């Protein structure tokens, strides 16, 4: 049995607990909060379910113990540097770190990779939402002057998005000042954004989200190949399930001495599922 611990017990951590309990090849090795000591942690792999900007600190501590880590780091422009930062310590201590292991980045990254292999020439559009972005919501809540927040992603076509950020202001704070702080954050720097002050964010809070990935391309010199993938999901539930599947993959990689830090596109898909080679080929191929 794979011993899996959870670090961080928010929406993703709670969903991960359920996913681990339903996995036939895993057992829950503990639930840890941000301020808990990790000195005596006993686990094969830890799901780091903390806010993105806290992940590297905890991952470094765990990898130094030879414990594999899974995270859902979601700042797309920083994924490569995040992976490279964790790689040396993982390799030094014989561990595996799978980064950005959610649905996007994560499994959507696999879809985009497969679409590129199918149509080497073309254009891919990833359209998120409408739905609540967990990463952007956490980032908005951390802004000075924000008491509570919800960030909703609105697709506007062609892989472009608008962010509607509903905020409850701290007493005495000015909307324009707080809005400028939000717009200046890396999470929000790349999309049009509306910051809306409300008395309560509860009417706008939801776990629903979705994606439509479309590619128009050329296969074997023939154009007008139309590829698409769509899903509507519960955000924390799916993110947690993917992290649990990546925990399985990390242990299989460690067993074959493939140490280091990786994204989902580095990993053989067969490693994600609780099947042996024969079962996987008979069922999936």
Mark where each language-model region is.
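NAD(P)-dependent Rossmann-like dehydrogenase/reductase catalytic/cofactor-binding core
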Residues: 230-285
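General beta-strand structural signal in soluble alpha/beta enzymes
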Residues: 71, 97-101, 127, 150-151
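Rossmann-fold NAD(P) dinucleotide-binding segment
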Residues: 45, 52-74
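C-terminal substrate-binding/catalytic lobe of Rossmann-fold NAD(P)-dependent oxidoreductases
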Residues: 3, 14-18, 22-40, 131-249
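Rossmann-fold NAD(P)-binding glycine/threonine-rich loop
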Residues: 73-97
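Glycine-rich Rossmann-fold phosphate-binding loop(s) that bind the pyrophosphate
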Residues: 9-10
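Rossmann-like NAD(P)H-binding beta-loop-alpha module
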Residues: 107-127, 136-139
